[in-house]
Structures are given as C-alpha cells and as structure tokens.
Amino acid sequence: MHEAIEPGILSRRVALTVAAAALCSPPAWAASKSEVLTVKHDMQPLQGETESLGLVVLRLLMDKTVASHGPYQFEALPPRDSITQSRSLLELRAGGLDVMASMNSLAREADGIQVRGCLRRGLNGLRLPVCLASRQAELEGIKDMAQARKLSVAQVSHWPDALVLERNAWPVQRIQRLGVFDAMLALGRFDVFLLASDEAFGIVQALPKLVVLKQWLVAYPSTYAFMVNHAKPELAERLRHGWKLTQADGSFEALHDKAVGWQVRQAHLAERRWLILNNPDQPPQALQQDAKLWHPLVRQRLIEPLLKA
C-alpha cells in the first residue's frame, strides 16, 4: 500500500530535485565555450604576401578571446584563381563565408555585420604610384592633382578605390585582376597604377621593370575592416571584444609593424607630396575608432582635420 503524499510536499521535492540537477550540470555558456568554433574565410595572400594580413589580424583577435569565448579553428575556402571582393561579398551574404576583410564603403554597409577597426591603420588610403622604371624621371615631377589628372591611371575594377578616384574627376581604367597590371603598364595601356602604401613594395620587388615613385602619393580617408555574416552576431561580438583587448595591450600595433612595417618605412610617407582627395563613399561612423589604431601620419593629416571640419 503506497503512502499518500500531499501535493505541496511533492512540489517541494520536485523543486529540490531540479535545483540539485542544475547545480550538477554545467551552465550553457560553459558548454558553448568547450565547443570548437569553426570560422570560414577566404583570406588568401595577395601578390607579394606570404600570408594574408587580414588572416593574421583575425587570428590575433580570435587568440585574444579564447579565454573568454572558447577555442576556434579556421576553415579556408579552396584557393581560386579569379576570386574578387564582389564574389566574396556574395558568399558572405549567402552564408558560404563567416567573415571577410574589405575596404569599407557605403555600398557595402548592409552586406554584413560591420566590425569597426581598421586592420590596415588607414594606410590603404595612401596610394603610391607605380610606373615603368623607364618613365620614373618623367613622372616624379607631379606637383598637384591638376597635373596628376592628366595621367592615365588604373585600378582593379572591384576595388572601391576605383570609384573614389572617379568621384574626384580622375578617369580610371578598370582592370579585372591585380595580376595583369604590370603587363598592361608594359604595353602602355596606362601611365600609373596606384597601390596601397602597406603593399606596394612587397608587390613591386618581384617586378624588375617597375618602380614605386618616390616624390608623391594620393591620399584619402579609408578604413579596411572585418565584416561578419549576418547569421553570426556572436562572432562579430567576439571580434569587437578582441579589438578592445589589443587596443589595451598594444599587440595589434606590434603585429602590424612586424607584418608590413618595412614597407611603410620604405615608402618615406612624411617626405612625399600628399595629393589629398575626398572619399564620399567612406562610412563616417567607421572613422570613429580608437586613435591608436590609425597610423600617426594618417591620423594627423587625414582623419583629425576631417573630424574637426
């Protein structure tokens, strides 16, 4: 014969059992931290790189947040010969990619969750002119934009930089991919090709018929940052937390200098004439980042005057 149990006593027993089980079970966040997060990307090295700068910085931010967010692994998409930023944006929107690094533009704001923080320190907006070595003496003498606009210039078609030049009344010859610019210079299709100050020497050192001009550069405010798939907000938050940690300990500046500092120093940026352009496609909110993330010259000559205007 079973002993009758009052409903109130039963309810208390059930509550105590549930509470005990909860104490013995790990919390949800602990379970998620023990899982390995897979991050899909397609950050392939550019011409002149051994490893993509974007991937190097992404690894830093992810490593900084292992203690708070758990382990991770990268899954790189198979290498493709004709990958473009436009193709990567399509894959980000479709879920084929979790994260990509790209120059910011108003047109790209809705393509993913924006993670503010320029991983190139604004140096992607300082463009160094590259030309045939046989024409160096002729082209070093450019003094202002009026003279520069008389030169025929080329950019890769899917780079937002091409649109920046066009919106500053500088007609641009668009080429389909970076790998053909040296051959087209040799054929006389255009006078100069503009490369970012943190990549130009790494690319041109393997092209003996070309030189990076020494006397002038084209400058405009520009940020180059991570975008995350809209379905991965937790990854975006993790990267933002990583940025805060690197700003606090200086590890990003050290990593950036190790990766591309030699190219920036070889460019002698302070000694050049800066031909400054507007960038109407630059999202203004992307400029509101920690001052330490900018290269000092970019901050002094481009960003601070713009923010004070």
Predicted regions, residues:
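A conserved helix-loop-strand patch within extracytoplasmic ligand-binding domains
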Residues: 118-163
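Short helices/loops that flank or line small-molecule/ion binding pockets
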Residues: 78-98, 167, 179-194, 198
